[in-house]
């Protein structure tokens, strides 16, 4: 049986959606193709252990996993989760109905815990462009991805949570972010401000430029009133 899940590959700040094709047929052995690096190749061992600790079985037949497009290098351990779910779906151990509706990423630990990934925001942006219903990601990455509106973003902590959701046994809490409210909540107010320093416009301008560009400033000597106040304001 052939099942498709979807992940994503990062190239700099750009994401490319990856189709994870899993086919189970007569025979033995596990084949992972599609230009995977060593971390991706090691996924079999993490997935097998996660299955065992969560009451599932690695099919005793020939398993072929293709990461498409095959000419793009696949790096990292974040493909563990989509590969694992593809294997479970292809072996009919879970429902495969929702697998192609979401972009799914996450590293699996041996006990089935889902570990964080990198690049949740560009992955979410690309998923929205391609019309996916949403994303299933590690809980630590959910808020970052949820900044992209119109997507259903679900943060998960374990493999079992994802399986229960796909089987319709339990609902996941959708992560939503109000970016406007977050901005105001994180706005910082200070008791003092540059407008309380009279004159010294050239010094204030230099410090503003340094702060905007993230440059270091060395204050050698200030021979005027406010000599302590100005460096303090810049530090704030």
Describe each PLM feature range:
Residues 1-220, 227-232:
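Peripheral, non-AAA+ core regions of ATP-driven protein-machinery
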Residues 235-236:
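Post-Walker A helix-loop "phosphate-sensing" segment adjacent to the P-loop in P-loop NTPases
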